[in-house]
């Protein structure tokens, strides 16, 4: 579905090269509490909370936004170069990247830090309590975009605050188009910071909640943000996504999942689809549909980097839902 407006947009020109993915890499420790949190929380005692949950199930996953995006991009046949800071415990993750053919020359290891760690406890209602230790991620500003060669486009995904600011500035100064994807890092920034990110970026992508916060802090509505970038992409969960580009408003439908197993990392899979479409010059409708299908394929598997498919399987699934794949 298309609607039109009179918005002006800046159209980026991509050089030949690869995607540079600036963002976090982390270990996700996921635990399952075999009950409901609400049965163990006293509403009148929340000011003096002291609880302990027995979690018989636990697993450790490779995660972080940059790692997840790179993994999904590799499934689509592209090689994304991750720029991130990690700690002395990165060895198992490094082996995982090597096994899957994902470069790590722009991943800086800090011997005195831990790799970012998320500790997630989920109850039987899929409510989550998460504690996150940023560790080495807080030093992401030590990495410089200029150290990476042959970059066609970049993405500034959730990372250390200073790193996100500096990488956006460095992409803009180098004339490299980039996606601003603030994600869960958005609350770190005030309105003036966000306005600068938007004005520097070529594309902006957020989910519905993040958009509400961005609009509130910047004072800009959808049309005002869309007029400053080549595309504003807002994902709306089960309602699909909306892409504002070239004065048009495109509605991208969801790709029905065969099973809903784990939504964690779906946003990163979606963003890999956006990058793939941009690298291969798809139109925005096809790019959005590729991104939508990536999110659905991810939701069918537990964890953020455990799903697999071949190129042929992806194209067949796409064509069964949306018609001819370019």
What are these regions (language model features)?
Residues 25, 159, 269:
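Active-site metal-binding loops of divalent metal-dependent hydrolases
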Residues 2-81, 92-95, 325:
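Glycine-rich phosphate/adenosyl-contacting loop at the front of the ribokinase-like
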């Amino acid at each position: 579905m298309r609607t039109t407006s009179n918005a002006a947009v800046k159209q980026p020109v991509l050089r030949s090269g690869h995607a540079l993915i600036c963002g976090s890499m982390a270990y996700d420790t996921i635990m399952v509490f075999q009950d409901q949190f609400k049965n163990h929380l006293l509403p009148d005692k929340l000011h003096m909370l002291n609880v302990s949950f027995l979690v018989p199930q636990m697993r450790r996953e490779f995660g972080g936004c940059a790692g997840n995006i790179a993994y999904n991009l590799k499934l689509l046949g592209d090689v994304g170069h991750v720029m991130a800071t990690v700690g002395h415990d990165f060895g198992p993750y490094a082996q995982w990247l090597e096994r899957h053919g994902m470069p790590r020359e722009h991943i800086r290891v800090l011997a005195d830090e831990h790799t970012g760690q998320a500790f997630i406890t989920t109850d039987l209602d899929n409510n989550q309590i998460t504690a996150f230790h940023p560790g080495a991620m807080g030093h992401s500003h030590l990495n410089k975009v200029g150290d990476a060669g042959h970059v066609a486009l970049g993405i500034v995904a959730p990372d250390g605050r200073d790193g996100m600011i500096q990488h956006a500035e460095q992409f803009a100064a180098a004339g490299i188009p980039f996606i601003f994807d603030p994600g869960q890092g958005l609350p770190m920034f005030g309105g003036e910071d966000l306005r600068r990110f938007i004005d520097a970026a070529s594309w902006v992508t957020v989910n519905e909640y993040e958009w509400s916060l961005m609009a509130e802090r910047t004072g800009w509505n959808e049309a005002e943000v869309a007029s400053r970038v080549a595309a504003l992409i807002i994902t709306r969960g089960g309602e699909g996504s909306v892409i504002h580009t070239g004065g048009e408003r495109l509605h991208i439908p969801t790709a029905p999942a065969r099973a809903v197993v784990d939504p964690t990392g779906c946003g990163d899979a979606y963003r890999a689809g956006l990058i793939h479409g941009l690298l291969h010059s798809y139109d925005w409708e096809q790019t959005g549909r590729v991104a939508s299908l990536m999110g659905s394929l991810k939701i069918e598997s537990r964890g953020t980097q455990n799903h697999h498919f071949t190129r042929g399987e992806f194209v067949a699934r796409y064509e069964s839902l949306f018609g001819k794949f370019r």
